Swiss-Prot record:
Coiled-coil features, chain-numbered ranges: none
InterPro entries: Cyt_P450, Cyt_P450_CS, Cyt_P450_E_grp-I, Cyt_P450_sf
PANTHER family per record: CYTOCHROME P450 98A9, OS09G0441700 PROTEIN
Mode of membrane association: Single-pass membrane protein
Name of the protein in its database record: (S)-canadine synthase CYP719A21
Organism: Papaver somniferum (Opium poppy)
């Protein structure tokens, strides 16, 4: 009994000693910083503000906290690495655009090293010569206007295949379809052509790449857990995630490596990457990054748009009438890639979808790469800043009825605040490199899917679930299932 009590006392003493040591380190870390931290919620020892960050999506929680503590606040996340959260378009513009070079560094979860060649991809690396060259290569070669224009015939053929696949699925399931996988595979084909310069009629590579992306999505939540809570990396679930990430890495290498032996056309991303004499792993994961960020962002946003149109049949009908009139006036049945920017209501629906459900509601964290300032207050080098895109898109002083899906708002005259607050692809020097392709493919897919089918609920009164999950992009918690009726 005495030994048992001694063991308990020893354990308690050890815990208290560790706790005291942690507090001392914490206080020293704070006193050493010259950053003038904005106000934020009170913290608890060890966990910081972690106790108030759960219960719902993080971007929503942070938006609600900003309403209490201000549009620029400090959140302490588990490991006592403070993060400045920006929820106001003026301050977001200061960080992302006006002082873009000051806040252009990155700080990523350790687990992401596995799938980024040790943070040597466009989205994961700090700004610098390597980052600038890699980004310029993607934009000026694979995503150049000339190269994208050369893909239009392929995109139009892909949409015909997509429509046929949906019709076939509907015929087997009493009119019901699950469009997301079809959308993803169409985007995999498009990105594959931009990377390799060859067509992928054989679905094997498309299926395998799609499967790897899906596999990574399933474990992405653990990477986020490690991001917000340092000690999560010691949990068994996180260790399983690391094992999963290593498995995904092996699968990606096995998929992409055979293409490195080819002699690709000069207007392809692969040719550019090989010309830079990068290590094999850098080339492979630069290619995989294009898939990872391009496939799910485009397909998920299209699925969100279809869900909104099912919930708002009058909006769907108005969009269909615009598409119907346009195709009739041009004596054809389908929309071409070149048409999408000539359709104002389509573009209004596209913008409103990206406002309501931005691809990344929390922008990838930026880090100050030198001593700088925010709102005239000192910010130390190494300070982490995160812009809450969701908050910018749902601020009542900028958006009338911000939680209502209302494309008409973009057909009216709007002020500078609306323009600067709509940032689905972020802004400044680290704006999404694939922004133009993403918008184009989203607009083109949505236009033809609404032109080809009437979209409705799977059963009367059962509307699509608009709950979301934050992974690499903002996903639908319940993948969209809909009933379609062919219009053509």
């Amino acid at each position: 009994m005495i030994m048992s009590n001694l063991w308990i006392l020893t354990l308690i003493s050890t815990i208290l000693a560790v706790f005291a040591a942690v507090l001392i380190i914490f206080r020293r870390r704070i006193s050493a910083s010259t950053t003038e931290w904005p106000v934020g919620p009170k913290t608890l020892p060890i966990i910081g503000n972690l106790h108030i960050l759960g219960g719902t999506a993080l971007h929503v929680v942070l938006h609600k906290l900003a309403e209490v503590y201000g549009s620029v606040m400090t959140i302490w996340i588990g490991s006592w690495k403070p993060v400045i959260i920006v929820s106001d378009f003026d301050r977001a513009w200061e960080v992302l655009v006006n002082k873009s070079s000051d806040y252009s560094a990155r700080e990523m979860p350790e687990i992401t090293k596995i799938g980024t060649a040790n943070w040597r991809t466009i989205s994961s690396s700090d700004s610098g010569p390597f980052w600038a060259t890699l980004r310029k290569g993607l934009q000026s070669v694979a995503l150049s206007p000339q190269h994208l224009a050369s893909q239009t015939a392929h995109q139009e053929r892909d949409i015909i295949k997509l429509i046929k696949n949906l019709k076939d699925e509907a015929a087997l399931n009493s009119g019901m379809v699950k469009p997301l996988d079809h959308l993803k595979k169409a985007t995999v084909r498009l990105i594959s052509r931009l990377i390799y310069g060859q067509d992928f009629d054989d679905d094997k590579y498309v299926e395998d790449m799609h499967d790897v992306i899906e596999f990574l999505i399933r474990i992405s939540g653990y990477a986020q857990l490690a991001e917000v809570f340092y000690y999560a990396k010691y949990l068994p679930s996180h260790k399983r995630a690391v094992t999963g990430a290593e498995e995904a890495k092996r699968r990606v290498i096995a998929l992409v490596r055979p293409f490195l032996q080819s002699n690709p056309a000069t207007n392809t991303y692969l040719h550019f990457l090989k010309s830079q004499l990068y290590p094999e792993e850098v080339i492979i994961f630069a290619i995989f990054e294009a898939y990872l960020l391009g496939v799910d962002s485009t397909s998920s946003t299209t699925a969100w748009a279809l869900a909104f149109l099912i919930r708002e049949p009058s909006v769907q009908e108005k969009l269909y009438q615009e598409l119907k009139n346009f195709t009739a006036n041009n004596n054809r049945t389908m929309l071409k890639v070149e048409d999408v920017n000539k359709l104002p209501y389509l573009q209004a629906v596209v913008k409103e979808t990206m406002r309501m459900k931005p691809i990344a509601p929390l922008a990838i964290p930026h880090k100050a790469c030198k001593d700088t300032s925010l709102m005239g207050k000192k910010v130390d080098k190494g300070t982490k800043v995160m812009v809450n895109i969701h908050a910018l898109h749902h601020t009542e002083k900028v958006w009338k009825e911000p939680y209502k899906f209302m494309p008409e708002r973009f057909l009216q005259k709007h002020d500078k605040a609306m323009e600067q607050s709509l940032l689905p692809f972020s802004a400044g020097m680290r704006i999404c490199a694939g922004m133009e392709l993403g918008k184009l493919q989203f607009s083109f897919s949505l236009a033809n899917l609404v032109n080809a089918f009437k979209w409705s609920c799977v059963s009367d009164g059962v509307l699509p679930d608009m709950s979301d999950l934050l992974g690499f992009v903002l996903f639908m918690k319940t993948p969209l299932e809909a009933r379609i009726v062919p219009r053509l």
